[in-house]
């Protein structure tokens, strides 16, 4: 099992190695282990990743250098030697043609690194078979935005909301616009470039330099309310929350956690929406 933390991670690539991927969303009871080797002001999610590694729950991990916290997490996890396979993917903060080429090259390097680690040969058909199209449901919903939410917190929100809930955080809104039949006709270099294009063409993370397309999230007529999640010591999404609070026309509830299971129980009542 390969764990990942970001929707820009090339999950389909690992299907070409016959590997399953799972988002790392551990929400530990506390940071007893990670606090021993990480700075006190590291964000709670970063600590949760370190905690999961130290508890032996993660053997293969792919990180993305989306922020300083993730870079520190990589350094710390690497120093522990607890992961059999640990990789940091260099993620562009733009979606122009040059950055797409850069990401495609990064995917190539990741492919080679995993071939060397696993001793497996990349299966192109397995990669292509990983792409699927999910139907879009045009029903009224409550959107969960901001920092990623754990399975525990997402379940708590769903249990307290009498309406469909859409996870629109950085791990929940992963949709790739890919036509498999077109990929099949391409040589490898062109195929991975098209793959990089699809990854970067997703609804942008707020960490992207041009995140204006995120406005479509707030302007969706089916959006009937927003639960906005922030994490202690993470400033990125606080700026977006301030903007939404000023301009949004639907009910808005902000919740903050430190990414422990204890804090999830005290982050606010979603039923208030």
Feature locations, PLM:
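An N-terminal assembly and electron-transfer interface module characteristic of large anaerobic redox
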Residues: 1-273
């Amino acid at each position: 099992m390969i764990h990942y933390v970001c929707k820009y991670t090339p999950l389909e690539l690992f299907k070409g190695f016959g590997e399953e991927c799972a988002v790392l969303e551990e929400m530990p009871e506390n940071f007893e282990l990670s606090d021993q080797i990480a700075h006190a002001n590291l964000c709670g999610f970063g600590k949760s990743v370190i905690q999961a590694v130290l508890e032996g729950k993660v053997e293969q991990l792919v990180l993305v250098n989306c922020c300083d916290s993730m870079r520190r997490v990589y350094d710390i996890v690497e120093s522990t030697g607890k992961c059999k396979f640990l990789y940091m993917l260099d993620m562009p903060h733009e979606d122009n043609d040059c950055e797409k080429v850069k990401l495609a090259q990064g995917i190539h390097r990741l492919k080679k690194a995993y071939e060397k680690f696993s001793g497996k040969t990349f299966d192109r058909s397995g990669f292509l078979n990983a792409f699927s199209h999910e139907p879009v449901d045009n029903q009224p919903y409550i959107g969960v935005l901001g920092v990623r939410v754990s399975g525990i917190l997402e379940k708590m929100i769903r249990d307290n909301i009498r309406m469909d809930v859409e996870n629109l955080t950085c791990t929940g809104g992963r949709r790739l616009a890919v036509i498999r039949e077109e990929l099949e006709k391409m040589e490898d270099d062109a195929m991975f470039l098209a793959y990089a294009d699809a990854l970067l063409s997703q609804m942008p993370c707020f960490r992207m330099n041009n995140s204006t397309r995120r406005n479509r999230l707030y302007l969706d007529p089916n959006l009937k309310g927003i639960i906005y999640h922030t994490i202690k010591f993470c400033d990125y999404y606080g700026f977006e929350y301030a903007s939404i609070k000023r301009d949004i026309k639907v009910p808005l509830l902000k919740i903050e956690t430190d990414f422990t299971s204890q804090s999830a129980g005290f982050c606010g009542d979603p039923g208030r929406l």
